Amino acid sequence: MPPPSDIVKVAIEWPGANAQLLEIDQKRPLASIIKEVCDGWSLPNPEYYTLRYADGPQLYITEQTRSDIKNGTILQLAISPSRAARQLMERTQSSNMETRLDAMKELAKLSADVTFATEFINMDGIIVLTRLVESGTKLLSHYSEMLAFTLTAFLELMDHGIVSWDMVSITFIKQIAGYVSQPMVDVSILQRSLAILESMVLNSQSLYQKIAEEITVGQLISHLQVSNQEIQTYAIALINALFLKAPEDKRQDMANAFAQKHLRSIILNHVIRGNRPIKTEMAHQLYVLQVLTFNLLEERMMTKMDPNDQAQRDIIFELRRIAFDAESDPSNAPGSGTEKRKAMYTKDYKMLGFTNHINPAMDFTQTPPGMLALDNMLYLAKVHQDTYIRIVLENSSREDKHECPFGRSAIELTKMLCEILQVGELPNEGRNDYHPMFFTHDRAFEELFGICIQLLNKTWKEMRATAEDFNKVMQVVREQITRALPSKPNSLDQFKSKLRSLSYSEILRLRQSERMSQDDFQSPPIVELREKIQPEILELIKQQRLNRLCEGSSFRKIGNRRRQERFWYCRLALNHKVLHYGDLDDNPQGEVTFESLQEKIPVADIKAIVTGKDCPHMKEKSALKQNKEVLELAFSILYDPDETLNFIAPNKYEYCIWIDGLSALLGKDMSSELTKSDLDTLLSMEMKLRLLDLENIQIPEAPPPIPKEPSSYDFVYHYG
């Protein structure tokens, strides 16, 4: 008979003693259980002790968290959090440097536990740590090592959100900023200092201003030229935080300062083109910087043109002048009147491809793209003048019905690029899809526009398009761009080459190929064959999903991006009856053994799988921290008794794998986008294999007719 659900069997360790095997009744008070354990080892004063996990982060067990204890867990009897906090408080202020160093090491480790952190903070522990840092006394021995542990403990304690970051003093900020600005500082101190400054900026608007005054652009950029990718990552993270929290009127100034210090080229040469693979966190920070840089365009994108603003109208005049040469300006001709000049302007604006020939300023009153489109056109006209003139004159000399309207095309293309690059949207926590080519040029967006407007003109000619085909051409151009971007070209020239290979005929071929599975096999016999094969394919997909769950996946812990990443791992037992999971010190490179995963959930106990906003950990997050990308990757397992295991998948692929696998375990349909894609691919492949012998044979829409009965059956011979 299985034990009651309130009873869990555990092993409890104590240094120098044999472990106790104990059945814990979860209905009993924790203090009573601790007393029983202490009595087993004849330890007095049981109120001085508590239980904590022996493995992983070694978290303390409280009345609130005791329900997480599972059968087979190994626990430790340990000094209670309040007593440990008191002892460490005394030891961190010891006159003996060895004692103080050991205390700081232990404090840095225990501070990750919220139970201990609460006790230590209640004893004004954070104030003690900040004073130690503010004193800046370079002790004769162990100074760097002790300071590193002090900063680690401080960061761990603050990360729990128990006290506000606003409590830190100017002296503390100056001291931390000093470690960042020093030319020769210990790597571990520099890393923690950068992380602390980033957390301050992200968590307090008032601290942002103080830190912005202390940290210079040059100081941060110098840390990008080192060989340590972790330091580079923290430096870019701080740059991103300062960028993100800067008032709108200051962001452009920051961007200009970064440009003067050649931030982009330093990142390109020392990070992206360095001799090291880009780690996940670095890729995320590069993605964030890319998004924030493009977001500087948002103001122009959302600014309408004022038709009465002469300076803005002069830009349109400049576009006309560059295209058609100042010498042909009618105002230079003797005796030219106002009406004649207006007629000439109208003709030129029509040749430039504006929708409103009389007053082209009206074309820029829609947002997006607003004035950003005009900025792009002027950049092309001035920086790539030959290209601009060629496109305009080439189209103005065509037959009317086949001319590609440059003005209208440029406006719509700018809007399209803003949509594709999501200009104006905040960075997503779970994404790391930066594009190296955007770090190869200070005016990457304008250069991208220049490449794509040439692509549009080329595609227009290949399609032999007319004005009525404008939207069709734009759809093809969008497809060409979105097919080229995922290849992540290293330079704009490589991107241009990729677009050249995606000609209109190639797009048609790709579309045709992708339609094969949908359009080629629609006759009733083929449909019937598909329906017969489909269950086999679904079973194959199901087995693949379950096999992937058996291999397991690594998941990043929520809320730890600003510090060293923490991970946990989950995998399905080979008999498909239990989910094993547990914390990890590092992101694993290979398979994690079942033995190293201490926690488990019986599949029979799983009640439901919820996703997105229905997940408990998404409801807990504030609206400011939520974003669409994280919601799309979130899912939770609800299991008895009223417990949850919360996930945020590293990417959409892993999300689909786990949702499908868990659904299959519960006997539900696999409904992810990946299943639909895999089903279509495998069905199409299987159908083609089975129909190889029928190549060039017309398959009828209906079965052949049944012939009439013969007039007699005299041809039948009966053997005697």
From Swiss-Prot:
Instruction: State the superkingdom.
Output: Eukaryota
Q: Where in this chain does the record put each PH domain?
A: 553-674
GO biological process terms, alphabetically, are: actin filament organization; apoptotic process; cell chemotaxis; cell motility; phagocytosis
Q: Which UniProt keywords apply?
A: Apoptosis, Cytoplasm, Membrane, Phagocytosis, Phosphoprotein, SH3-binding
An annotated GO cellular component = cytosol
Disease linkage: Vascular malformation, primary intraosseous: An autosomal recessive, rare malformation characterized by non-neoplastic severe expansions of blood vessels, usually seen in the vertebral column and in the skull. The most commonly affected bones in the skull are the mandible and the maxilla, and life-threatening bleeding after a simple tooth extraction is frequently observed.
The name on file for this protein is Engulfment and cell motility protein 2
